[in-house]
């Protein structure tokens, strides 16, 4: 029995020294397995007398139970330690800054369009849209552009078929609006337009904003005031100088082009658009009596305004999809 006590203490000490589950299982097999010394002691019970057998058997069972209990406790401790180690290695440090998602920006032409629309909407203008594929009537005839006018030539205009074109301006939207609405009319018509032209300052497709006012007693002074106020707000310069030069457009009479004072220009002035009083023939073609109503119209190149506002020298940069360029905005 002295051997039993020594074996028990030895087994318990080895259990306590086990550093992992594999080492712990080795101790279990070595002491409680089929060939283990504690198991072997049970096999000697048959050699004892009937009186000794229950006493010795009880002590052996007690020793085995002590070792087994120690094994269970150690196993639970090792399993808990393994779980904690795994959790520690897989934990997420919520104090770290998260990954930032890059936020895209609006295209400079879109920014410019939005800015123009916002300025005019703030003073009561409505935004009107129209088809980009137009018939000859709305793109030319209703705007007092005669059949022999060079703008109708194929080298200036994209023809879809004999009677339909990719609109060369947004003026057809003005005609359609006058056909469907009674004055007073205060609108702007932003959109894409198309012309056979491509160089540093021209592209086959570009954006235009045209404005139209039709009401009683509208004068050229109203037109000038509208354009000057718009340009000063757009460029955020209250002292911006604007000049008007006589010009010719089939759909307006009188007609003018307007420039702004610009230091980097060779002449000190830059053209930014055209304008004029709506021609009586255009009013009549749209069902508006020119004896009762007058109106003015103007047109602005959106890319030109964007180039000036953002300091871009080549119009084509807006449409080349160069991310290094576009990320500046």
From Swiss-Prot:
Cell membrane as UniProt keyword: no
Gene Ontology molecular function, alphabetical: ATP binding; magnesium ion binding; phenylalanine-tRNA ligase activity; tRNA binding
EC number, as in UniProt: 6.1.1.20
GO cellular component, one term: cytoplasm
Binding-site residues for Mg(2+), renumbered to this chain: 253
Cofactor: how bound: Binds 2 magnesium ions per tetramer.
InterPro entries: aa-tRNA-synth_II (IPR006195), aa-tRNA-synth_II/BPL/LPL (IPR045864), Phe-tRNA-synth_IIc_asu (IPR004529), Phe-tRNA_ligase_II_N (IPR004188), Phe_tRNA_ligase_alpha1_bac (IPR022911), Phenylalanyl-tRNA_Synthase (IPR002319), tRNA-bd_arm (IPR010978)
Cofactor: Mg(2+)
Primary site of residence: cytoplasm
Keyword check for Transmembrane: no
A Pfam family it matches: Phe_tRNA-synt_N
UniProt subcellular location: Cytoplasm
EC category name: ligase
Catalytic activity line of the entry: tRNA(Phe) + L-phenylalanine + ATP = L-phenylalanyl-tRNA(Phe) + AMP + diphosphate + H(+)
Entry similarity comment: Belongs to the class-II aminoacyl-tRNA synthetase family. Phe-tRNA synthetase alpha subunit type 1 subfamily.
Binding partners and assembly: Tetramer of two alpha and two beta subunits.
Database matches in NCBIfam families: pheS (TIGR00468)
Record protein name field: Phenylalanine--tRNA ligase alpha subunit
Gene: pheS
């Amino acid at each position: 029995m002295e051997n039993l006590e020594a074996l028990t203490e030895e087994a318990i000490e080895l259990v306590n020294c086990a550093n992992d589950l594999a080492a712990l299982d080795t101790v279990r097999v070595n002491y409680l397995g089929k060939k283990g010394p504690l198991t072997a002691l049970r096999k000697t019970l048959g050699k004892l007398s009937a009186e000794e057998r229950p006493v010795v058997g009880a002590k052996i069972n007690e020793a085995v139970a002590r070792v087994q209990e120690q094994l269970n406790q150690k196993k639970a401790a090792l399993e808990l330690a393994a779980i904690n180690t795994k959790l520690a290695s897989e934990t997420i440090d919520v104090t770290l800054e998260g990954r930032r998602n890059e936020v895209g920006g609006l295209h400079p032409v879109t920014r410019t369009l939005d800015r123009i629309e916002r300025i005019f909407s703030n003073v009561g203008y409505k935004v009107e849209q129209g088809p980009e594929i137009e018939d000859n009537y709305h793109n030319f005839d209703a705007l007092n552009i005669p059949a022999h006018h060079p703008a109708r030539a194929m080298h200036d205009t994209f023809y879809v078929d004999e009677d339909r074109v990719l609109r060369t301006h947004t003026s057809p939207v003005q005609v359609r609006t006058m056909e469907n609405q009674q004055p007073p009319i205060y609108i702007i018509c932003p959109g894409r337009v198309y012309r056979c032209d491509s160089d540093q300052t021209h592209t086959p497709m570009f954006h235009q904003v045209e404005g139209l006012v039709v009401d009683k007693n509208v004068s050229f002074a109203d037109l000038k005031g509208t354009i000057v106020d718009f340009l000063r707000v757009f460029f955020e310069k209250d002292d911006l100088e604007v000049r008007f030069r006589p010009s010719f457009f089939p759909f307006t009479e009188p007609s003018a082009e307007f420039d702004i004072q610009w230091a980097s220009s060779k002449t000190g002035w830059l053209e930014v658009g055209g304008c004029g009083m709506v021609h009586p023939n255009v009013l009549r073609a749209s069902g508006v009596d020119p004896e009762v109503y007058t109106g003015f119209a103007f047109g602005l190149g959106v890319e030109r305004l964007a180039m000036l506002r953002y300091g871009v020298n080549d119009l084509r940069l807006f449409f080349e999809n160069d991310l290094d360029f576009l990320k500046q905005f």
